[in-house]
Every structure is written in structure tokens, then in C-alpha cells.
Curated annotation (Swiss-Prot):
It comes from Wolbachia pipientis. The lineage of its organism: Bacteria, Pseudomonadati, Pseudomonadota, Alphaproteobacteria, Rickettsiales. PROSITE patterns: RNA_POL_BETA. The gene is rpoB. Coiled coil: none annotated. Pfam families: RNA_pol_Rpb2_1, RNA_pol_Rpb2_2, RNA_pol_Rpb2_3, RNA_pol_Rpb2_45, RNA_pol_Rpb2_6, RNA_pol_Rpb2_7. It catalyses: RNA(n) + a ribonucleoside 5'-triphosphate = RNA(n+1) + diphosphate. This is DNA-directed RNA polymerase subunit beta. NCBIfam families: PRK00405.1 (NF001616), rpoB (TIGR02013). SUPFAM superfamilies: beta and beta-prime subunits of DNA dependent RNA-polymerase. Its EC number is 2.7.7.6. GO terms for cellular component: DNA-directed RNA polymerase complex. One of its GO terms (molecular function) is DNA binding. DNA-dependent RNA polymerase catalyzes the transcription of DNA into RNA using the four ribonucleoside triphosphates as substrates. Belongs to the RNA polymerase beta chain family. The RNAP catalytic core consists of 2 alpha, 1 beta, 1 beta' and 1 omega subunit. When a sigma factor is associated with the core the holoenzyme is formed, which can initiate transcription.
Length: 1436
């Protein structure tokens, strides 16, 4: 962003508030910002479901599946017309504050049509279909249209989250098996023989699963919904196929003819390698080949070419064959043999007697074709169509009496009814692709042909034809269900429930004087949606620790949830990396446990079918184009894809003729002419969190996993600082996370303060005024994880902003870049044993500067209930509490904002009425004597917990509608109303300023008024002047109309906000008031806190060492943090060393820039001193020439130095003054040139051509301004997989004047002596994680006990004790500490009588105690008795 008046060459560098980063990457970036919409997976899916301005097809399609609804007697029907989503009533911030759901009402227009008596519903539908209005009137008794509220639909926020009951939640996308058919085998693991058992499974999107499988005997079975298996012939006969049909569909036939013997066609291909057990004779009976001679393919071809078309076959070779169709005697029309029946010798003779000269047999050779279908058919060859249906019904509905009509309808609904079965369009596509079918995509049910083709394919697999290539972990077989699909399914489920409720209501209601809304209960659908958002495993409490954790949570993929896996079944295969994950799912950011979570890769997107796609650049004739295409895992396997390491010339052509490419899941070397695509970017493989780790390629994958996970645990700091060594993704993460404020439209900043930013918005051309945009900043708000959300403005009044610019930073954001930690001076060395085992030593200076101080917001709530004895009351008059403990409460009894509170402070004073019978006698006596009423109630105030110490930053008071507000609630509302009023006035002022300026220009340009006279006229009168002038009246009238509309809109918005403010709150039943108190707790760094780097290098602070005791450099600079060098080689995360080196160089380069700036400042100070020491005459000459004749006392040093823009004119100044100015000018010019040259040399170490050009072009003033931003270090980027090589790092060291080893001499801060050898020192980016010692340390003396075992509870949340476990007992046994062990296992654990006695002993001052029987022993005895073992403990 730039100032409104900026111009000249300085604009480019000053277009950022953050310092431009010099990239140390090996190639310039090629990725467009539009590809980095990091929450598109959430917003895109939800927006495709919810209605928008263009269409609402998906929502209306769900309504059309339920409607029309008719009553059982067909007296009336309810028809759906259209639907819409109403406007939002409350904003996101109001919903969070009120604790309600951010939702909008779904309103549908429906029509209730009541039929005339005796008119059937079918007749009405028929007339309606033909659109015959004249006949419709004769069949309709009445028809009423009405808009009906159906439900409250939770709406997605701009950040891709939902606000449910005031809490931000995320719907995690789910990976599950794609609908379709999958073939598999057991890989020979089921049986010891190693025989392959093949199976097929049809998985629908909605409906029953169909499994088809072989058994060990090669019989083919099927299952429905994993119930008991049945022979496949039962399913086929239920489809209406006969035995003949079954055999003809799945088996080929051979025809045997009888004429002077049985003849068979001769096919050469079938005889390759065959030995016939009989002599091969032609039809004339000539022997062509003796028995048992092996027939080669050449011999078979020669026989065929020599005229052998048919050959004679002996009787014994026909015996045992199976008929392919029924044999019917044509004379008597009787069945001789049935299809599938085996032919015997007597059958052949019988056929000859009946003069049957042709038979068709099944072509089964038990080698290439097996008798699987035939054998399965023999299991139930006499089963009929009806019996087959009954068998299936009995398996799925055991115990119910089958009725044919019901059974037929039931079987049809299983697979062939769209109402109960849905393959989805992707399921149909996969079925078509796998089975070679050509059905339309919108046919989403199974067909008979589908089932037949599935059976045919599994039989071919068993015959050895084809292979099982369905890898269930292949991303072609796994799809993603996102939030829009989940809500669509829930909406459909809720509407089905609603439809059933409507039918029940219509059947029991009289249809006289009813309207459509009488039958629609909106709670039914609302409850279904509410249950999903509240209780679904995929509706999760958003991880809001920092912006990165938010964005990672939204991009997470889960295999758990409804329709997915369970934690127990999420094995290694599910979590393992698959070749198809490349560019789609991150191989690094995977779960460390069996929780089956993954993260989307950076540039991955999800297509309309739910498959993950990755972008690639198109390659045409060896030329890499800028055309970007997305490929799914299915498409990717068809092309040769090169990676980004392929060398390109200046024309983007491949340099090498042979390239390594990915193809079908493997790496192959191919000619560059065959390459179709190339990777878009090296980092497209990894996720957002992993892309923030510099030098990731130098880290072990396990440590990189820890690094990406720990960045999500980093606590936002009070003073966030962007990393010196970044990866270039920080700004994308910041802007995509929703933590920053982005400009919705371009414009000019009208005002900017800590609470809001006001921008006058213009169109994209910057010409036409649109409106006033007000951005309210979030100030010290509590996140889901109690971290602090605080936004700070980046823009100033008069700045020009563009659409999408970052105008305010958020938590853990610094100048629009993600800033999770601090850059610290680190030394890798051991120091007095305090950094043993990854422990970390921190300088006290780090704590003193609050570098790692974080603010956490704790929320406390006090609820006022209605009790049987009366309502509780918030008051300052609390019985039994001294006045000195109430000084921080206001008159209403609520703590004041800004109060510093500690453990045990009263936050809200509250008393609860109690019955007088419960008062002790002495209290009743005091009440009688003194007339005290305070004894009628008990103190139930809200106190701070023991571990809280901070400042009250906000108080919110919620009063139920209709209840009387207390004074504090009134003051809070009054303050908010005043804020709304100020906002309204500010908007109107901005509108007035713009429109009156425009009107002024029109009047002056038209000649109606001149510049002087118009100032003496009231502004409101300008409109009349313009309207009276006919030449500009239309223009003024249009301007006046826009002005009135915008002012009216601002006033209307103000009134609406005030009305909502005074309407009260919806509180739970029995609650009249609720008070929330927010306390800001400051956590400084202390021993026990966990810290980490970005490379998986983590540790706990062991000691905060005084700065004077820390090791220091030769120039006296103390080290900030000491890490153990042994933590590097064993963890193999060398990236942290490279980051340390580059950070060290960046810091030293910044110091060099600072030295040059100091030299320039020194020159300027000397010149200013010389000017101020001039004589009066000389100063007057100088002031006349350079300072506009200003007086000596009216100028400052900056004005003096800024005035010298060129060498002086010798004629106007004396020689001494001319020499002084010339020397200053030349000295500054040389210093500026030196600075410019140095910066160009620094930035030329990478792909920074644009920055180098800008440095050359900008003027000296902008150069100095730019250089001042680099004094603390020159920030650089090391893109993932494209980090700087060793030569570049060495060059940086040379520029910075550092030793190439990266090691320096250190001195001991305690003794001042030099350490024995040089130490690796540099700057590393360190994070403070949310594992704070304040949340871990816990102590207990007495507390709650378990009811069963009477042992102390465990954990800080239960105020539990420290468990003395099994291994601790072994330790005491090893030392022979019998009495200590007895004490631990009895009186200090669960010996009830013993711990009472030891308490009494302590009171009496007696050190003796007795141990009894622990309660756990009694529990064991009772458990044994439950197993019928009577165990008694008898004393001797």
C-alpha cells in the first residue's frame, strides 16, 4: 500500500509495509496467487450447496426428492415451488457474544392442493402434466400457496468456519471409499494352499452393499450388507434368469454334429500344445495324427490349411461334457436332457436313436475356462424365481412372513430404486469404466447388466484372465466428502423425517380450513442439522491456537467419522504414503498415532466428483507452457510427468533429451518428446505447515513432521517478529487464515485507529465512489484455546489500498507475514550440564524484553438462576465478606474493567436464598436480636481460581428478554449505543465530504458559482443552486439521489443495530441473567515452558540465566539461547544448522547496512553543526537559497539536510560556504552510492532481479528509508526444496565478513575466559509452545477420592494426586524400604480408617500410626466373589 500522494520510482519498494524479502531460491517463482486459496476446500464446497444469486439447484433438488407429499387417502398433496435463504439476523461477532448459532432461515414456497371428492391423485397429476388449466379447476377443491420456514441453516463465515452456540467449529473433510465396484483377492493368505480367493464389492453412495466372492471349492456366492452368503444363482434367478439364460450369459458353447460319427469344428488356436488322447481323424475317417502327439501351433495351422475344418470325436470324449441348453425331442416335445446336465454314454446312444444330430455343450476345459457358474448352479438347480426372492428376503428380514408382492418390492428397492439406492454420478462413471458399459451418468442405480458384468469379470479373473489392480489406497478409489456434501446429506435426512411427519399429520387432520404451514414443523429439520454440528465426529472444535493451526485444521482430511474407519481399524496401510499422494496429500504432515488424519498439499484442490487434483504445467513439443491443468490420480497415470529439476533453456524448452518422469506410479527414463506435463512447483508435494520450514530438504522426515506439528502449537506472542529466514509462504498463510483484515474493495483510508479502519471505497478504476467500508478490529478477544486475538492497523490516513491488501495484522502476524516466534542469537554448546537431554538455557534478557511473553484470555461466567425460594441476585452486599474485599466491585456487584485480580478475588457478587429452617440456632438468635436479613441468603459469588492472576479486560452482562436490567447492563448497552452513533456520524461525515466535494466541482466547473463566493453559502443550499441550473440539473439530481440513499442507509443500519441491542437475550430455561468476565493473564517465559524450532528441535527450559553470566561474543554481545549440539546429528535435522548460518549472515549484513547509515548520519550531523555555526550573513544567504528564507530558530536538522538536492551555485555563495556544501553533497553522494552498491550485491545472490532493479531506480531518500528497515537484519526466503546452495551461503558469509565455518570465539560470562574451541553461533527462529509450565504444575494435599477404590483421583483437572505406580513400588522393594512402601500402599492411598487415624495423630502431635487393609484389597475380594470364589480374610 502507498500514500495517496506517492509517486516516482520509490513506489515499488514502498508498496509493502513489510520489508521485501530477498529470495535465496534457485529459480523465480512461477505460482500464481490465485492458486493459493487455502480455505477453498471449505468455502467452495459449502457455496456449491447453499443458494446464491445465480442458482440454488442442489437445495431445490433435495426438496424435489421429497415433494410432492400426499396423504394416505389421496385427499390432498403438498407441492414444492421454490426456496431461498433469508438474510442473516446477527453478525458473526454478535453470535459469538450471544452464544448463538450463526445461521439463516431456509424459506420455501409450497402449495397445498385439496382434491374434489372422488378425484384420484393420479388424475390430478395427469392433468397437471398436460398443463390443462381448464380441467384443473374441475378436480381441485382448493389450492393455497404459502412461504414456510423450514429450518435454521448454519452459515459459513468468511474464514470457512461455523459458529455453533457461540463457538467456532470446523467441519473436517472425510476421505472414504469412492462409490463403484472393486475387485480384490486375498493374496493367498486365507488358506495354507496359497489358493487365490477372488471377490468383488459394489459400494454405493447410499444403499445396500453387494459382495460377490468365491469359496475354496470355487463356488460363487453373494452377500447383501454382509449378511449370510447365498449362491450366486439365487441372485441371478431373482433377476428373472432361467438356467438356460444363466449358462448362455456366462459360458461359451461348442456344437457337436452327428453324421457318420460325432463331428467337432477344428480351431487351430485351441490346439496349441495339446496332446489328444485319441487319433485325430478327418470326417472321412482318415487318421491325420496319432494319439498323444503334441500339437504345435505350426502343425495345427498346417492341418487347418490342408482342409481340416472338422474332425471326428469318439464317444468317450463326449461323455462327461455338459449341455449348454435343454435337449427337446421334436417328435414328442419332451425334454430329454436339461441344460447343465452331464452327458453319459447311454445318453449318446439315446440321442442317436432319436435321430438328434446336433448338440450344444459348454466349452469347459478346466484350464482356461472353469465350471464355476455351473457348479454353483448345481447347488440349487431347481430353485424358481419366487423361491430365490424368498431366500434373499429370509436372510435380510429373518422371522417375517414373505409375501410375493412385498418381497418383489423389497428386492427392487435394494438396488434398483433411486429412492433407496444411489450410486452417485461418480459411482456410475467408475462402473462404466471398470465394466466397459456406456450408461448415462445420471443413472445412479444398479441395472441387471451391471450385476451380470460384475459376475462375468470375477469369473474371468478366476480363469486367469486379467489381474486385480484395484488398490483401495489409490486415490482413484478414494474420494473426499466435504462440508457441502455432509450438510446436503443431513438436509436430505431431515426432509425425509419431515416428510413422514407431514404424512402422519395429514392422515389424522381434517383438511377444512388448513394452510401449508399447519403441517410443517421446522424443528424436525433444524434438530437434524443441530445434532450433526453438535455431535458429529467430523464437526470439531476449531484449533485456534494460532493462524497456522486454524488453516491446517480447515485443510485436514480424516478417514474417521460416519461411513469411514474407526480409530481401532485405522491401520498402517491407511496412514501410509501412497504414490498417488504426490501433489495431493502431504507425506510429511501425517499423524503420529492411529488417528487417520492427513493434510491437503498446498496447491491441491477437490473436483466436483470429490477426487483430489494437483496442478501441472502443460508441455507441448518439449516446450513448457504457462498453461496450468489440474489432473486427478486417475488421469495422472496416463501421462509422463517430469519434475521441476528438469533443465530448461531461455525458451522454456527441455535441454536434455532423456528425462526421469513419473508414469503409472513408477519412475521411468523417457525421451523428452513423450513428456506431457511438468510439476508446477517443488513444494506442491507438501502441506502448508511443512512449507513453512526452511531447508526442509535437509531434515529427516520424522523431525520435519514434528516441526510442522509444533508450529501449530506455537502461542501468539506479545511482540511477534517475522523470521529472518523464511520460505515465502508466510504472507500467503497470514492472508488466507482469516487472522488479518483484508480490504474488500480498493479506496482511500479515511481514518485508522486501534479499534476500526474506515475506507472510502471506489470502483476498480478508482473513479466512481461506491460506499464507506468500516472494518472493526478484534481487540483482546478469547480464542478457542484461550489465546489472545488482537488486531492492529497497518494503514494510515490517506493511504491508498487495493482489494485484498492486508490492512490490519492479527495474532502471530507481523506486517502481513506469519510470525509465530522470535529470532534469537543461538549457540550450540554445552553449558554446565543445564542443557542435558534437549534442555534449553535462556538469557534473562529475553525474559526482560518480553520477547516470549504471551497473553491468554480466561473466561469466567456467573449465572443467575431462578430457585424455588426465589431468584438469585447479583449484589455487592455479600454476607460474611469484608468491605476491603469488595473495593474492586461496582455498585451492581460486578468487577470493574481494568482491575488487577488474583487468586480468590470476587468477580461477581451473588447471593442465593436459603430456607430459614436450614439456619443454625445461633444465626436465628442474631437475626432476632439485630433484625439482619442477610442471613436469608448464602454467598454464591464467582471467585477467581487459584492459578489466575491478571487484569479484567471485559465484562458482558446478558439479561433475559422481559427481565429488568441492572445498572451495569444499562451502562454497557449505553456505551455500545454511543459507539454505534459515532460510527453512524463518521459514515455520514465521509459521505458528506465526498458528495459535497463533487457538488462543489460541478458548480464551479459549470460557472454557477466561483471559488470565493461558494464558501459563503451553506452547503445544504448548494443543491438548490445546482437544481436550478438546467445545464447541470440532471447531474446534480442524480448525485443528490445517491447522497440521500447512502445517508438513509447509514441511519437505517444504526437504528437496526440499536433495536437489536435493546431486544434482550435468549437464555436457558431458569436463567434470568448471565455475567461473563474476561481476564487477561500474562505468561512470561520461565523454566518448565516448552520451546521448539521449526525443524523438530524441541526442548524444555531448564534455567533462565542472568545475562551477565551468559557466554558472549568478542564484541560483548551476549548469547540469547544455548542448545545442545548433540541434538543435531542423532535427529538428522541439519536444516536448523543451515538456518542458523543464513540467519547469522542476514543479521551481520543488516549491521553493515546500519554502519553505512550511521556514517551517513554522521556526515549529516557534521554538516548541520557547520551550518548552525555560520555567521548571520552567511546563514541568511544559505537560507535564501535553500530554506525559503526561514529563520535560524524555525528550522531543524532534517530540513537542512533535505534541502541540499544539487551542487551549489558559486555565484550566489562565497567560496567557504560553497566548499562546505560541495563537500557535504559529494560525501552524501558517495555514501549513498556505497549503500546502493552494497544492497544490490546482497540481493543479487538469488532470484531477486526486480528488487535489484528497484534499488537502482529509487531516489536517495527512498533508499535511506528502505535501508533503515534492514538494520535489524536483511530478511530472506529459502523456498522449500529450492534453498540456497553451499556456494550462495558462503558468498553471504563473505559479504557479511564472517568466517566460512560459521563458528566464532565465545567467552564465558562467569569467568571471562575464552572457551576452548570455536562455537557455532547464529540466528534461529524459536517458538514458545502452548505446553506451559503454569498449566502443568500441580500439587495436592487432600482432595477427591474414587468411589470404588477410594484411591485419589488423577490429573490436574480432577485435583488429583501423584500416582505411585507399579514401577515405583519395585524401586522401594529394591531398596528394602518396607515401611515406606507400606505407608504408600495404605494410609497415603486407600486405607480409609488408616488415613483418618493418621490425621488425628497429626493433630495430636503423635508421630505413630497404624496401617489397615487398603480398600483395593476389598475390591479384589468382591470381584473374586462375583466369580463364585468365596474368599475370607481370617486373623490368625
Amino acid at each position: 500500500m502507498s500514500s495517496a500522494g506517492d509517486s516516482g520510482p520509490g513506489y515499488v519498494l514502498n508498496d509493502f509495509d513489510a520489508v521485501p524479502r530477498g529470495t535465496r531460491g534457485r529459480r523465480p517463482g512461477l505460482v500464481k496467487d490465485s492458486l493459493l486459496d487455502l480455505v477453498k476446500v471449505q468455502k467452495g464446497s459449502y457455496n456449491s450447496f447453499t443458494p446464491n444469486n445465480e442458482s440454488n439447484e442442489r437445495l431445490e433438488a433435495i426438496f424435489h426428492t421429497i415433494f410432492p407429499i400426499s396423504d394416505p387417502l389421496h385427499r390432498a398433496t403438498i407441492e414444492f415451488l421454490n426456496c431461498r435463504v433469508d438474510d442473516l439476523k446477527y453478525s458473526e461477532s454478535e453470535c459469538i457474544k450471544r452464544g448463538i448459532t450463526f445461521s439463516a432461515q431456509v424459506i420455501a414456497s409450497i402449495r397445498l392442493v385439496i382434491m374434489q371428492d372422488g378425484v384420484s391423485l393420479e388424475k390430478y397429476q395427469e392433468i397437471k402434466e398436460y398443463d390443462d388449466h381448464s380441467k384443473l379447476a374441475t378436480v381441485i377443491k382448493s389450492a393455497e400457496e404459502q412461504e414456510v420456514r423450514f429450518c435454521e441453516l448454519p452459515m459459513m463465515t468468511d474464514k470457512g468456519t461455523f459458529i455453533i452456540n457461540g463457538v467456532e467449529k470446523v467441519i473436517v473433510s472425510q476421505m472414504h471409499r469412492s462409490p463403484g465396484v472393486f475387485f480384490d483377492s486375498d493374496k493367498g493368505k486365507t488358506y495354507n494352499s496359497g489358493k487365490l480367493i477372488y471377490s468383488a464389492r459394489v459400494i454405493p453412495y447410499r444403499g445396500s452393499w453387494l459382495d460377490i466372492e468365491f469359496d475354496v471349492k470355487d463356488h460363487l456366492y453373494f452377500r447383501i450388507d454382509r449378511k449370510r452368503k447365498l449362491p450366486i444363482s439365487v441372485l441371478l434367478k431373482a433377476l428373472g434368469l432361467s438356467n438356460n439364460d444363466i449358462l448362455n450369459k456366462f459360458m461359451k458353447n461348442r456344437v457337436y454334429k452327428h453324421k457318420s460319427g460325432w463331428k467337432v469344428p477344428f480351431f487351430p488356436d485351441k490346439f496349441k500344445g495339446v496332446r489328444l488322447p485319441f487319433d485325430l481323424k478327418n470326417v472321412e475317417g482318415n487318421v491325420l495324427l496319432k494319439a498323444n502327439v503334441r500339437i504345435t501351433s505350426k502343425l495345427a495351422k498346417n492341418l487347418y490349411d490342408n482342409g481340416l475344418k472338422e474332425y471326428l470325436i469318439p464317444y468317450d470324449s463326449i461323455c462327461g461334457l455338459f449341455l449348454a441348453e435343454d435337449l427337446i425331442d421334436s417328435a414328442s416335445s419332451t425334454k430329454i436332457l436339461s441344460a447343465g446336465e452331464s452327458i453319459k454314454l447311454e445318453d449318446i446312444k439315446k440321442l442317436e436313436l432319436l435321430s438328434i444330430d446336433k448338440i450344444s455343450v459348454l466349452n469347459i476345459d478346466n484350464v482356461s475356462v472353469g465350471p464355476y457358474i455351473l457348479n454353483t448352479l448345481f447347488l440349487d438347480e431347481n430353485m424358481s424365481y419366487e423361491n430365490a426372492l424368498y431366500e434373499i428376503y429370509k436372510v435380510l428380514r429373518p422371522g417375517e412372513v414373505p409375501v410375493l408382492k412385498i418381497v418383489e418390492e423389497f428386492f427392487r428397492n435394494l438396488f434398483f430404486s433411486p429412492e433407496y439406492y444411489d450410486l452417485s454420478n461418480i459411482g456410475r462413471l467408475k462402473l462404466n469404466s471398470c465394466l466397459g458399459l456406456n450408461y448415462e451418468e445420471n443413472l445412479t442405480t444398479l441395472t441387471h447388466e451391471d450385476i451380470i458384468e460384475i459376475i462375468r469379470k470375477i469369473v474371468l479373473l478366476r480363469d486367469g484372465q486379467g489381474s486385480v489392480d484395484d488398490d483401495i489406497d489409490h486415490l482413484a478409489n478414494r474420494r473426499v466428502r466435504s462440508v457441502g456434501e455432509f450438510i446436503e446429506n443431513q438436509f436430505r435426512t431431515g426432509l425425509l423425517k419431515l416428510g413422514r411427519a407431514v404424512v402422519d399429520s395429514m392422515s389424522t387432520s381434517s383438511l377444512d380450513k388448513v394452510s401449508p404451514s399447519d403441517f410443517i414443523n421446522p424443528k424436525v429439520l433444524t434438530n437434524v442439522l443441530r445434532d450433526f454440528f453438535n455431535s458429529s465426529q467430523l464437526s470439531q472444535f476449531m484449533d485456534q491456537t494460532n493462524p497456522l493451526s486454524e488453516i491446517t485444521h480447515k485443510r485436514r482430511l480424516s478417514a474417521l467419522g460416519p461411513g469411514g474407519l474407526t480409530r481401532e481399524r485405522a491401520g498402517f496401510e491407511v496412514r501410509d504414503v501412497h504414490p498417488t499422494h504426490y501433489g495431493r496429500i502431504c507425506p510429511i504432515e501425517t499423524p503420529e498415532q492411529n488417528i487417520a488424519y492427513n493434510s491437503l498439499a498446498i496447491y491441491a484442490r477437490i473436483n466436483k466428483y470429490g477426487f483430489i487434483e494437483s496442478p501441472y504445467r502443460k508441455v507441448v513439443n518439449k516446450v513448457v507452457t504457462d498453461q496450468i491443468e489440474y489432473l486427478s490420480a486417475i488421469d495422472e497415470g496416463l501421462y509422463y510427468i517430469a519434475d521441476t529439476s528438469a533443465k530448461l533453456d531461455e525458451n522454456n524448452c527441455f535441454v536434455d533429451d532423456m528425462l526421469y518422469c513419473r508414469y503409472a506410479g513408477t519412475f521411468v527414463m523417457v525421451n523428452s518428446n513423450q513428456v506431457s506435463y511438468i510439476d508446477l512447483s517443488p513444494k506442491q508435494v507438501i502441506s502448508v505447515a511443512a512449507s513453512l520450514i526452511p531447508f526442509l530438504e535437509n531434515d529427516d522426515a520424522n523431525r520435519a513432521l514434528m516441526g510442522s506439528n509444533m508450529q501449530r502449537q506455537a502461542v501468539p506472542l506479545l511482540k511477534p517478529t517475522a523470521p529472518l529466514v523464511a520460505t515465502g509462504m508466510e504472507s500467503f498463510v497470514a492472508s488466507g487464515s482469516g487472522a488479518v483484515v483484508l480490504a474488500k474493495r480498493g479506496g482511500i483510508v479515511d481514518s485508522s485507529d486501534s479499534n476500526s479502519i474506515v475506507i472510502r471505497a471506489f470502483d476498480k478504476g478508482g473513479i466512481n465512489y461506491l460506499d464507506v467500508d468500516i472494518y472493526h478490529l478484534r481487540k483482546f478477544q478469547r480464542s478457542n484455546h484461550n489465546t489472545c486475538i488482537n488486531q492492529k492497523p497497518l494503514v494510515h490516513v490517506g493511504d491508498c489500498v487495493k482489494e485484498g491488501d492486508v490492512i490490519a495484522d492479527g495474532p502471530a502476524i507481523n506486517n502481513g507475514e506469519l510470525a509465530l516466534g522470535q529470532n534469537l542469537l543461538v549457540a550450540f554448546m554445552s553449558w554446565q550440564g543445564y542443557n542435558f537431554e534437549d534442555s534449553i538455557i535462556i538469557s534473562s534478557e529475553v525474559v526482560k524484553k518480553d520477547l516470549f511473553t504471551s497473553i491468554h484470555i480466561e473466561e469466567f461466567e456467573c449465572v443467575v438462576h431462578d430457585t424455588p425460594l426465589g431468584s438469585e441476585k447479583i449484589t455487592r452486599a455479600i454476607p460474611g465478606v469484608n468491605e476491603e474485599n469488595l473495593y474492586h466491585l461496582d455498585d451492581s456487584g460486578i468487577v470493574k474493567v481494568g482491575t488487577r485480580v488474583g487468586p480468590g478475588y470476587i468477580l461477581v457478587g451473588k447471593v442465593t436464598p436459603r430456607h430459614s429452617l436450614s439456619l443454625p440456632p445461633e444465626t436465628k438468635l442474631l437475626m432476632t436480636i439485630f433484625g439482619e436479613k442477610s442471613f436469608d441468603c448464602v454467598d454464591s459469588s464467582l471467585y477467581t481460581s487459584p492459578d489466575i492472576e491478571g487484569i479484567v479486560i471485559d465484562v458482558q452482562v446478558f439479561t433475559r428478554r422481559g427481565e429488568e436490567e441492572n445498572e451495569r447492563a444499562f451502562l454497557i448497552k449505553q456505551k455500545e449505543a454511543n459507539d454505534f452513533e459515532k460510527e453512524r456520524d463518521h459514515i455520514i461525515n465521509v459521505i458528506n465530504q465526498y458528495f459535497y466535494d463533487e457538488l462543489r466541482k460541478i458548480l464551479i466547473n459549470s460557472g454557477s458559482q466561483d471559488r470565493e463566493s461558494i464558501n459563503f453559502i451553506e452547503r445544504e443550499g448548494w443543491w438548490d443552486i445546482g437544481l436550478k441550473n438546467q445545464s447541470i440539473s440532471k447531474q446534480v439530481e442524480s448525485l443528490k439521489k445517491d447522497f440521500d440513499e447512502k445517508v438513509s442507509h447509514a441511519i437505517t443500519n444504526f437504528k437496526r443495530k440499536v433495536e437489536k441491542l435493546h431486544e434482550g437475550y435468549d437464555l436457558p430455561q431458569g436463567v434470568s441473567m448471565s455475567v461473563k468476565v474476561f481476564i487477561a493473564v500474562k505468561h512470561s517465559l520461565q523454566p518448565g515452558d516448552k520451546m521448539a524450532g521449526r525443524h523438530g528441535n524441541k526442548g524444555v527450559i531448564s534455567r533462565v540465566v542472568p545475562v551477565e553470566d551468559m557466554p558472549y561474543l568478542e564484541d560483548g554481545t551476549p548469547i540469547d539461547i544455548i542448545l545442545n549440539p548433540l541434538g543435531v546429528p542423532s535427529r538428522m535435522n541439519v536444516g536448523q544448522m543451515l538456518e542458523t548460518h543464513v540467519g547469522w549472515a542476514c543479521k551481520k549484513l543488516g549491521e553493515k547496512v546500519g554502519n553505512i547509515l550511521d556514517e551517513i548520519n554522521k556526515i549529516k550531523r557534521a554538516f548541520c553543526e557547520a551550518i548552525r555555526s555560520l555567521s548571520d550573513d552567511d546563514f541568511e544567504k544559505f537560507a535564501a537559497l535553500y530554506l525559503d528564507n526561514k529563520k535560524f530558530e524555525d528550522i531543524n536538522d532534517d530540513e537542512i539536510t533535505a534541502s541540499i538536492l544539487d551542487t551549489p551555485n558559486k555565484d550566489e555563495l562565497n567560496n567557504e560556504l560553497t566548499t562546505l556544501v560541495e563537500n557535504y553533497f559529494n560525501s552524501c553522494k558517495d555514501a549513498h552510492s556505497s549503500l546502493r552498491h552494497f544492497l544490490i550485491e546482497v540481493y543479487s545472490c538469488g532470484s531477486n532481479l526486480s528488487i535489484c532493479n528497484n534499488i537502482r531506480d529509487i531516489n536517495d531518500n527512498h533508499l535511506i528509508e528502505f535501508a533503515y528497515k534492514l538494520r535489524d537484519g536483511i530478511p530472506v526466503t529459502a523456498p522449500v526444496f529450492e534453498g540456497p546452495k553451499d556456494e550462495q551461503i558462503v558468498k553471504l558469509f563473505e559479504l557479511a565478513g564472517l568466517d566460512n565455518s560459521g563458528q566464532v570465539v565465545l567467552y564465558d560470562g562467569c569467568s571471562g575466559e575464552k572457551f576452548d574451541r570455536k562455537v557455532t553461533v547464529g540466528y534461529m527462529y524459536m517458538l514458545k509452545l502452548h505446553h506451559l509450565v503454569d498449566g502443568k504444575i500441580h500439587a495436592r494435599s487432600v482432595g477427591p477420592y474414587s468411589l470404588v477404590t477410594q484411591q485419589p483421583l488423577g490429573g490436574k483437572s480432577h485435583f488429583g494426586g501423584q500416582r505411585f505406580g507399579e514401577m515405583e513400588c519395585w524401586a522401594l522393594q529394591a531398596y528394602g524400604a518396607a515401611y515406606t512402601l507400606q505407608e504408600m500402599l495404605t494410609v497415603k492411598s486407600d486405607d480409609i480408617n488408616g488415613r483418618v487415624k493418621i490425621y488425628e495423630s497429626v493433630i495430636k502431635g503423635d508421630s505413630n500410626f497404624e496401617c489397615g487393609i487398603p480398600e483395593s484389597f476389598n475390591v479384589m475380594i468382591k470381584e473374586l466373589r462375583s466369580l463364585c470364589f468365596n474368599v475370607d480374610l481370617n486373623a490368625k
